[in-house]
Amino acid sequence: MVDDSKKVWPTGLTIAESEEIHKHVIDGARIFVAIAIVAHFLAYVYSPWLH
């Protein structure tokens, strides 16, 4: 890893590889938030004690 100047410590990934992984992590978080919003909306609609 010391030989390759494009790899970043401590992961050993290049900047492009880390940006690609970051994109997937952010996309996954957005999907999680969307599911959570739908779940909270459905809980509000179908729970009489929340009205």
UniProtKB/Swiss-Prot annotation:
It is a single-pass type II membrane protein. One of its GO terms (molecular function) is electron transporter, transferring electrons within the cyclic electron transport pathway of photosynthesis activity. GO terms for biological process: photosynthesis, light reaction. A bacteriochlorophyll binds at residues 22, 40. It is found in: Cell inner membrane. Residues 47-51 are periplasmic. The gene is pucBC. It holds the Pfam family LHC. Keywords: Antenna complex, Bacteriochlorophyll, Cell inner membrane, Cell membrane, Chlorophyll, Chromophore, Light-harvesting polypeptide, Magnesium, Membrane, Metal-binding, Transmembrane, Transmembrane helix. InterPro entries: Antenna_a/b, Antenna_beta_CS, Antenna_beta_dom_sf, LHB-1/5, Light-harvesting_complex. The core complex is formed by different alpha and beta chains, binding bacteriochlorophyll molecules, and arranged most probably in tetrameric structures disposed around the reaction center. The non-pigmented gamma chains may constitute additional components. It comes from Rhodopseudomonas palustris (strain ATCC BAA-98 / CGA009). Belongs to the antenna complex beta subunit family. This is Light-harvesting protein B-800-850 beta chain C. Residues 1-23 are cytoplasmic. One of its GO terms (cellular component) is plasma membrane light-harvesting complex. The chain crosses the membrane at residues 24-46. Antenna complexes are light-harvesting systems, which transfer the excitation energy to the reaction centers.
